[in-house]
Amino acid sequence: MIKSELVQKIAEANPHLYQRDVENIVNAILEQVASALERGDRVELRGFGAFSVKKRDARVGRNPRTGKQVDVSEKTVPYFKTGKEMRERLNTGK
């Protein structure tokens, strides 16, 4: 599912809301999550999961085309851990 499909599904489930307003709300939520992650904060949506950032150490990699060693610098990457309720829902098929 892509963002526009998510907006459409939410708008269909809430006919009292305009699709444009739903899109603005979804964008605002995503912006707040991104801003929190930028600051290094953890974002927990209880029952769904938690977004956080992790540091990935610098390492020596390999160029798959040439086989040459390449230095890969340290970087910060987003991380998502599913919540208990979401894992249970996925495993029971509900």
Curated annotation (Swiss-Prot):
One of its GO terms (cellular component) is cytosol. InterPro entries: Hist_DNA-bd, Histone-like_DNA-bd_CS, IHF-like_DNA-bd_dom_sf, IHF_beta. It comes from the Bacteria. The keyword Transcription regulation applies. Keywords: DNA recombination, DNA-binding, Transcription, Transcription regulation, Translation regulation. Gene3D superfamilies: IHF-like DNA-binding proteins. SUPFAM superfamilies: IHF-like DNA-binding proteins. One of its GO terms (biological process) is regulation of translation. GO terms for molecular function: DNA binding; structural constituent of chromatin. Belongs to the bacterial histone-like protein family. Heterodimer of an alpha and a beta chain. NCBIfam families: hip, PRK00199.1. This protein is one of the two subunits of integration host factor, a specific DNA-binding protein that functions in genetic recombination as well as in transcriptional and translational control. This is Integration host factor subunit beta. It comes from Xanthobacter autotrophicus (strain ATCC BAA-1158 / Py2).
